[in-house]
Amino acid sequence: VHIPDGRKVGEALSRVTHLGVGAHQDDLEFMAFHGIVECHDSDSQWFAGVTCTNGAGSSRSGAYSDHTDDQMQEVRRAEQNLAADIGKYAAMIQLDHPSAAVKDTGDTALRDDLLEILRLTRPRVVYTHNPADKHETHVGVTAATIEAIRRLPADSRPQTVIGCEVWRGL
């Protein structure tokens, strides 16, 4: 867990009001821009991000054309943490699941991780991918997010859940 302002993890997570749950590094800054901006420099609202995959399948061209999967994971992790620093997030959590596991509806590890994050943060607003998204990894993240929310007691669920489009058209 990356905490841009250096607070303890429990304190950082307990102040979250807006939570973005995205499949890949850089998804959050497109799909949850509203929440990031709304919380930026606020004393009463805090954005936290969750990136579910490890970045191993990232595109490789130009300066990255010779990078291994491990090297790309480090590059993407550093990029996402820098975005959290710039956006002054309460926290940035990178779960490092392989994309294949996220797309596997029988694999409950992501859902369980998200359930724990939701319990610790208790956000009012959750941003995730659009359920009609064409990207299978995005749909896997959406399904796991909704399943995790539905496992929470009704009084612990977010007030608002927003499905956002970030990749091509619907």
Spans of model-derived segments:
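Metal-dependent de-N-acetylase/amidase catalytic core
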Residues: 1-19, 100-170
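ATP-dependent adenylation/pyrophosphate-handling site
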Residues: 14-15, 19-71
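Active-site neighborhood of phospho(di)ester-bond hydrolases with catalytic His/Asp-centered motifs
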Residues: 21-23, 50-52, 95, 127-129, ...
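A short helix->loop->beta-strand "cap" motif at the edges of active sites that frequently abuts
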Residues: 44-45, 89, 156-160
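A conserved beta-strand->alpha-helix junction
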Residues: 50-53, 82-98
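His/Asp/Glu-rich metal-coordinating catalytic cores
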Residues: 72-75, 86, 90, 107
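Short, surface-exposed alpha-helical segments at coil->helix boundaries
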Residues: 73-81, 142
